[in-house]
């Protein structure tokens, strides 16, 4: 099922509707607290990288997953991509299958087991930062600076799966840039205030094969 994102989520400041919905963020807050206290398992047989987001919506994580896969492959690493199976994410799974070596299962633990069985060296997960059972070796958060964190509130009051302060527990940020250099600086400054040690990488996207269309 595809859910259309509410317009008020991406307003720079919370409006009346987002404030009214604040009490409904409590279950997500409790869930996030529990995840932080649960014991997670780190695999000793394979290196795991998770590329995900805390903003619900397009942040460029799948294109970045493909790019990182190809870079590691070119460097000679035996790498594979993992994607938890969701029936409504067929398009993403098809893109990944066409561009990478892909493992899909209904559980991320099964994906790890299959990658180990196939004697892979590195496993890149597309999505899964909020996974309860796995401790990844490297956790990367993707953002689009056009929307950034929207109104800054959690779902359903805003677009965030976790509070922005959760950047403290992540290793790197990949920021899809806009043409506004001042906006890029402001977001970078905000990220560094939360986690001075986090690595920040900047990306941009260029359309290819436009000659295929009769424009």
Where are the predicted features?
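Hydrophobic anchor at the start of a short beta-strand
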Residues: 77-79, 139, 200
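Phosphate/Mg2+-binding loops and adjacent switch elements
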Residues: 87-195
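A transmembrane-helix-recognition feature enriched in membrane-embedded lipid enzymes
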Residues: 2-48
């Amino acid at each position: 099922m595809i859910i259309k994102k509410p317009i008020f989520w991406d307003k720079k400041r919370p409006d009346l509707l987002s404030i009214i919905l604040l009490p409904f963020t409590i279950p997500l807050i409790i869930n996030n607290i529990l995840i932080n206290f649960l014991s997670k398992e780190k695999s000793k047989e394979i290196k795991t990288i998770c590329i995900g987001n805390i903003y619900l919506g397009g942040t460029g994580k799948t294109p970045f997953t493909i790019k990182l896969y190809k870079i590691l492959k070119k460097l000679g690493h035996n790498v594979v991509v993992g994607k938890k199976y969701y029936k409504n994410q067929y398009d993403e799974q098809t893109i990944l299958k066409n561009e990478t070596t892909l493992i899909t299962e209904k559980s991320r633990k099964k994906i790890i087991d299959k990658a180990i069985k196939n004697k892979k060296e590195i496993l890149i997960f597309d999505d899964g930062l909020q996974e309860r059972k796995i401790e990844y070796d490297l956790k990367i958060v993707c953002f689009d600076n056009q929307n950034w964190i929207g109104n800054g509130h959690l779902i359903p009051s805003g677009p965030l799966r976790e509070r922005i302060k959760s950047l403290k527990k992540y290793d790197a940020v990949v920021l899809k840039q806009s043409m506004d250099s001042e906006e890029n600086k402001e977001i970078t400054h905000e990220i560094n205030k939360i986690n001075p040690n986090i690595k920040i990488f900047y990306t941009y996207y260029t359309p290819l094969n436009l000659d295929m269309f009769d424009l």
